[in-house]
């Protein structure tokens, strides 16, 4: 037998037992005539002692180096009271080694487990990086999450049904990864960006509660929290309303946090998209941050200051204020840095006002813009934002998008910089009632979620007549500023689906070519249905306390969508390309 126990599982209950351990040398120390090693496996570390009583094992131990793969047979003994290590789960015991076998030696490592390595090193030698206890713990947590999800779904009547990986390219927002067909020359499969259409077809097939933990693929520019291939917890239901779907999913996330962290998330507040953008400048607000945006354009229409009266009198303008409590200590240098920061989002400047003494009116404030404000306007402003002595006010004034984006980002930065964001808290919420459509960079209408989302209380005729007023029956779950899941009630009426396609500029011929199977299926008694998908990678990020999605994926890609370990992607064999009728044109 190669193993009877895991290293990290040993404790006082095992004292006196003979054990066989298999794992790696984490560290070695020579103390006089004794040799100690910390031995590691996926469950943790235990101290092993080599004593002259077992001379053969001691002699062999002298050749051990870090990351040798070994087997130990010995007895679990109690550590002396003065040697108990309270920082280790196994710190009350050690193993007295009676025999030692070396499975495999290890060359000097290209990584140093005791120092920070570059991300490039970590990804190139990922198999070594994953040996680090913190990485092993993250992947164990991920496994616990998927185990919990499967149990929860099974208990609530959901069926785990697989959907195809090789499918048809359909417009879902990002670029597809294409797979050429050898049999059907010149034709391509697409790897799915999500199982969206297949799970809707399953609802039409009568499987009223579906789920799947599934790989999805998007060929898009990457960020710290994005990967070209990612994992979704995908869910779809029939005959449930949006609030009922949210209730089930909220219950699942409650259980997940309770089982993983021992944390009670409490009742999730529900907030409309409009309120989230107005108060926080984001559709995924981090409610740990107490700062809010307050609209003041109506108070500044008559001021003789172009920066303010322009947006104040523009129907598409916005002036928003962030009040920072006790912020008068913020220096001019810091204000200049914040001004540069909002410039990233298109803002042309950042006005500010320090409140030194409310009772003194104009004499009690300090600001380059104070000279443009009357006593009445100043008083109304200070009352609107509920200013207190010692506060500083920051003003954003521009078109609606620039002001909202810039001040929303500034709110987050101020929260971090000034220690206002309560990092130890968990603040979940639902965001609902998104716009059905938004304008893309060319000014055309695009679906804010996807083209299969149902509008709220709109007929096809009303939607076609006034699409920009439509609200989507959609919902996102947000935790600490991260969108962890999103979903919607789906369109189940063929006329409504065709109307949405037309609004998006998809003509009838293109509808038949790309979505003919869906439009046909909608004609045969399609039930009302709704669903949601969680990002498993992002959930695991939150539950393990990392801010890099690559830390919770065993073999992730870089921000250039490359695998440094296997050197993927690589050039294909010319013969294989010939069989696929694919020609590679070299870029000049």
UniProtKB/Swiss-Prot annotation:
GO molecular function: aspartate-tRNA ligase activity; ATP binding; nucleic acid binding
A Pfam cross-reference name: tRNA-synt_2
Catalyzed reactions: tRNA(Asp) + L-aspartate + ATP = L-aspartyl-tRNA(Asp) + AMP + diphosphate
Keyword flag Nucleotide-binding: yes
Gene3D superfamilies to which the protein is assigned, alphabetical: Bira Bifunctional Protein, Domain 2 (3.30.930.10), GAD-like domain (3.30.1360.30), Nucleic acid-binding proteins (2.40.50.140)
Primary localization: cytoplasm
GO (cellular component) term, any one: cytoplasm
Residue segments, region Aspartate: 196-199
Keyword check for Chloroplast: no
Keyword terms: Aminoacyl-tRNA synthetase, ATP-binding, Cytoplasm, Ligase, Nucleotide-binding, Protein biosynthesis
PROSITE patterns named among the record's database cross-references: AA_TRNA_LIGASE_II
Domain of life: Bacteria
Binding site for L-aspartate: 172, 218, 449, 490
Coiled-coil segments on the chain, per record: none
Residues binding ATP: 218-220, 227, 483, 535-538
GO biological process, one term: aspartyl-tRNA aminoacylation
Enzyme Commission code: 6.1.1.12
Protein function: Catalyzes the attachment of L-aspartate to tRNA(Asp) in a two-step reaction: L-aspartate is first activated by ATP to form Asp-AMP and then transferred to the acceptor end of tRNA(Asp).
Protein family: Belongs to the class-II aminoacyl-tRNA synthetase family. Type 1 subfamily.
Subunit structure: Homodimer.
UniProt-recorded name of the protein: Aspartate--tRNA ligase
Gene for this chain: aspS
